[in-house]
């Protein structure tokens, strides 16, 4: 039997770089919220212990794909603790809607969905804490998708505090370029000394993203999309880009602006949600 699982997008409603550690990683403060929009992962169980990704990603080796790595990590962790039923395997396919290098967390969300879904389907019995800890070894954004609640993140993104920001409507636009995260984080002009503030203070301030000035400077496509969106609503970069989003109170307002978008702007409208669609599907 094949089951389908949501793999939602996320937005960084704000993102501030507060420092850089000796190991090169940047410390930050950011606010994650999910969207009711994303990829869909289909899983069909196997009884021969094999993991097969039926929809390979161009340019990514099978064993390097985060979906496969997540499944293999769960197999190893559950087996090491005697919680993996014999023969646990899966055929996995993905209906991909989220762009790579877009700042929407697509790969991290895919990995988290696989961890949560296979843990459930195989009846391994690992806790969300255990799955989140495993997810962190795959990527800094994976734990928030595993835990499934909007969160204020600190450290390098691994210290999560659940929060409930307003669930607004967003027009999310892709400028047509992919921005590898290191391109932004290695830029010498990236702000790295934004003062740390409490979540209470940050929620009262106007939201912004420290990476935006670098993305706009280095990628004229990002600058063009933001310049257009800012004529209609508060807009900013998500993550390290390339996607940007404009914020609206109603779906109709967001759709009206999207209908006026120039032909070169590729976008969609989605609602911000504080409970992940993945976790809603499991209720």
UniProtKB/Swiss-Prot annotation:
The active site is at residues 10, 141. ATP binds at residues 99-109. It catalyses: 4-CDP-2-C-methyl-D-erythritol + ATP = 4-CDP-2-C-methyl-D-erythritol 2-phosphate + ADP + H(+). The keyword Transferase applies. One of its GO terms (biological process) is terpenoid biosynthetic process. Keywords: ATP-binding, Isoprene biosynthesis, Kinase, Nucleotide-binding, Transferase. Its EC number is 2.7.1.148. Gene3D superfamilies: 3.30.230.10, GHMP kinase, C-terminal domain. Homodimer. Catalyzes the phosphorylation of the position 2 hydroxy group of 4-diphosphocytidyl-2C-methyl-D-erythritol. Belongs to the GHMP kinase family. IspE subfamily. This is 4-diphosphocytidyl-2-C-methyl-D-erythritol kinase. It comes from Escherichia coli (strain 55989 / EAEC).
